[in-house]
Amino acid sequence: MRQGRSATPTLLIVDAQSVKNADTAGFKGYDAGKKVSGIKRHIAVDTQGLPHAIAVTTAEVTDRKGALLALQRCKPALCKVQALLCDSGYVGKPFAQGVKDILGEHVSVQIAKRSELHTFKVMPQRWVVERSFAWLEKNRRLWKNCERLLNTSLQFIHLAFLALLLKRF
């Protein structure tokens, strides 16, 4: 690619974002942890912040299940991935085993932990996925979920990242 990197990443950074529903939204779920009624966007990005796996679910779906769904949907394009960097919402052997079942036994799951719970601290490499979510928020249509179908919301996320890529390159 233009930046001198391989098109297939070896490290993916995984995270989920809860988004509130508008009145017109068709699917509704409740994320009890963040107290949001709406949907969740699950993305896995490379070190440049470019998405390689995306899934949209109702908000009650756990981060772990949503990430596995995103990885399963994009499995053929993720053949060279060696490691996943996740936050503490992805802790657990079932998630790590699910990643190994989807991507292969060679893939390791690394959990980035905060040293102190009640202080804000930027975690190394985790900010990349947060920046990708911020890029999505620049699109007015993605501020809230107003789509009747989850697939429509997913396609608008793809369009937003495509527009970003076209501007960037």
Where are these regions (language model features)?
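Active-site- or DNA-interface-adjacent structural scaffold in DNA-acting proteins
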Residues: M1-K28, V45-D46
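Mobile genetic element proteins and their domesticated derivatives, centered on retroelements
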Residues: D15, I43, G49, A67, ...
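Short glycine-rich loop/turn motifs
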Residues: G38-H42
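Active-site beta-loop-alpha junctions of metal-dependent nucleic acid enzymes
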Residues: A55-P76
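Helix-centered, glycine/charged polyanion-binding patches within enzymatic domains
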Residues: E60, C79-S153
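Charged phosphate-binding loop/patch that engages nucleotide di/tri-phosphates or the phosphate backbone
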Residues: F156-F169
